[in-house]
């Protein structure tokens, strides 16, 4: 009979409930909300087809290849408990559909077209299982957690950071001054805000220079290694690279990139440069909420976090947990572990749909940042553990006596919490007490505690 033209029925080949997934398959879990009257199997096959080899009609060139070898398969569909008309569709993609070492291509394939599909009211990519065979084609983070600790000579505690505010409008000299004060007071890092690139009131080269001066001055005075996340994000990859090169010439330890607005291609290039030249890479997730905030449509942040670990970054912002709902704590810790650990078991209560084996890809430090202050320190230490960066922007700069005392307050609070934990005390229960005790002998901490005391401390 040869070839039969016509619009085709997805039932034919893309829904295969008896398929046994291969170790080399990339697996995806999609949350589907089909249009009224569309059965979930139909929607599931449509997703599998459109994100792999399918098109809407039979084409004669299908006969020139083995579709069976290259097609995505929807191999399982389950209703979502407690939600009306929502299903999780599991899709397996053969490894050969993807270019090696390209997060960009992986996303183009898996989420490129299918989210506009008519048969679906909404679609969300909840998780991806990246097989070791594909993981191994990526460099991953430039250095990873252990190498970073060795470079900085800081062990056994979370690292402290601070975003310099006001984020826009300071001159380079005053900006550098604020950096110096914070580092001098006891922080490990200060940070360019994600919107600080190279604006008329402060060009990037001037900022880099004054920040480098601040770093070296603070290092000389404290005897500790200091850093400032110099934002290398730019309008072109060439310009971004130029900024990273200048940072390396200044001898500073770390640069920064906005990986979603900058794009995965730029980010991966920068990560490769950073490994080749000994720079740490701090990643900010500006724009993530556009993609991950809706519960039923978009991409969950855990997928963006996995993608970043493949593309490359040593730190990434990952929410604070503090003062949020209890459920979010487990979900956040789920993707925090996906960033840090080598091997993570499937655990649906933490939102982890697949067991993920990263083999030896370096880990990423999660960064807790946004609306946190000294009273949160026990909770943060308890939740994130040692391998994290705690960032207090307003929580440092708004200390009543200035930046340096604000930094002192945070460092004292952190050291007190770490010591209490090491002595076996329960940070969840005794957190407030630990901070109060420490503030008795640290006037800076006492002043900070006073400012934020009416803000609730909740686990």
Curated annotation (Swiss-Prot):
The disulfide bond which can form in the large chain dimeric partners within the hexadecamer appears to be associated with oxidative stress and protein turnover. Its EC number is 4.1.1.39. The modification N6-carboxylysine is found at residue 191. The keyword DNA damage does not apply. Binds 1 Mg(2+) ion per subunit. The modification N6,N6,N6-trimethyllysine is found at residue 4. One of its GO terms (cellular component) is chloroplast. GO terms for molecular function: magnesium ion binding; monooxygenase activity; ribulose-bisphosphate carboxylase activity. It holds the Pfam family RuBisCO_large_N. It is an enzyme of class 4 (lyase). Substrate binds at residues 113, 163, 167, 285, 317, 369. It catalyses: 2 (2R)-3-phosphoglycerate + 2 H(+) = D-ribulose 1,5-bisphosphate + CO2 + H2O; D-ribulose 1,5-bisphosphate + O2 = 2-phosphoglycolate + (2R)-3-phosphoglycerate + 2 H(+). The record marks 324 as: Transition state stabilizer. Its main location: plastid. One of its GO terms (biological process) is reductive pentose-phosphate cycle. The keyword Chloroplast applies. Gene3D superfamilies: Ribulose bisphosphate carboxylase, large subunit, C-terminal domain, RuBisCO large subunit, N-terminal domain. The active site is at 165 (proton acceptor), 284 (proton acceptor). Its cofactor is Mg(2+). It is found in: Plastid, Chloroplast. Mg(2+) binds at residues 191, 193-194. The basic functional RuBisCO is composed of a large chain homodimer in a 'head-to-tail' conformation. In form I RuBisCO this homodimer is arranged in a barrel-like tetramer with the small subunits forming a tetrameric 'cap' on each end of the 'barrel'. Heterohexadecamer of 8 large chains and 8 small chains; disulfide-linked. The disulfide link is formed within the large subunit homodimers. Belongs to the RuBisCO large chain family. Type I subfamily. PANTHER family: RIBULOSE BISPHOSPHATE CARBOXYLASE (PTHR42704), RIBULOSE BISPHOSPHATE CARBOXYLASE LARGE CHAIN (PTHR42704:SF15). This is Ribulose bisphosphate carboxylase large chain. It comes from Cephalotus follicularis (Albany pitcher plant). The gene is rbcL.
């Amino acid at each position: 009979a040869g070839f039969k033209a016509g619009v085709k029925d997805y039932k034919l080949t893309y829904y295969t409930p008896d398929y046994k997934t291969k170790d080399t398959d990339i697996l995806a879990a999609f949350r589907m909300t089909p249009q009224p009257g569309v059965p979930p199997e139909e929607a599931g096959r449509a997703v599998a087809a459109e994100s792999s080899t399918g098109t809407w009609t039979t084409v004669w060139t299908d006969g020139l290849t083995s579709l069976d070898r290259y097609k995505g398969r929807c191999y399982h569909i389950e209703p979502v408990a407690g939600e009306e008309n929502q299903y999780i569709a599991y899709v397996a993609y053969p490894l050969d559909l993807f270019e090696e070492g390209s997060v960009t291509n992986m996303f183009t394939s898996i989420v490129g077209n299918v989210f506009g599909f008519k048969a679906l009211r909404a679609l969300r990519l909840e998780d991806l299982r990246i097989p070791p065979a594909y993981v191994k084609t990526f460099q991953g983070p430039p250095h990873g957690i252990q190498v970073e600790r060795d470079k900085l000579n800081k062990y056994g505690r979370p690292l402290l950071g601070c975003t310099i505010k006001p984020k826009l409008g300071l001159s380079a000299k005053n900006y550098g001054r604020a950096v110096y004060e914070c580092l001098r007071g006891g922080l490990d890092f200060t940070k360019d805000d994600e919107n600080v690139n190279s604006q008329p009131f402060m060009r990037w080269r001037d900022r880099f220079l004054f920040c480098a001066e601040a770093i070296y001055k603070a290092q000389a005075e404290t005897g500790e290694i200091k850093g400032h996340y110099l934002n290398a994000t730019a309008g072109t990859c060439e310009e971004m690279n130029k900024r990273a090169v200048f940072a390396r010439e200044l001898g500073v330890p770390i640069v920064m990139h906005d990986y979603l607005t900058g794009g995965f291609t730029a980010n991966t290039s920068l990560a490769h440069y950073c490994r080749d030249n000994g720079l740490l890479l701090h990643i900010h997730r500006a724009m993530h909420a556009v993609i991950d905030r809706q519960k039923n449509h978009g991409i969950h942040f855990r997928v963006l976090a996995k993608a970043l670990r493949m593309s490359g970054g040593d730190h990434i912002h990952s929410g604070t947990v503090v003062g949020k709902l209890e459920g979010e704590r487990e979900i956040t810790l789920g993707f925090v572990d996906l960033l840090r650990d080598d091997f993570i078991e499937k655990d649906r209560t933490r939102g982890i749909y697949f067991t993920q084996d990263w083999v030896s890809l370096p880990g990423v430090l999660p960064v807790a940042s946004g609306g946190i202050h000294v009273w949160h320190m026990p909770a943060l230490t308890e939740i994130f553990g040692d391998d994290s960066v705690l960032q207090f922007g307003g929580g440092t700069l708004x200390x009543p006596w200035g930046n340096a005392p604000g930094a002192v307050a945070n460092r004292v609070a952190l050291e007190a919490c770490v010591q209490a934990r090491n002595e076996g005390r329960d940070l969840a229960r005794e957190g407030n007490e630990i901070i109060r005790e420490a503030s008795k002998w640290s006037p800076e901490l006492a002043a900070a505690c006073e400012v934020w005391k009416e803000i609730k401390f909740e686990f």
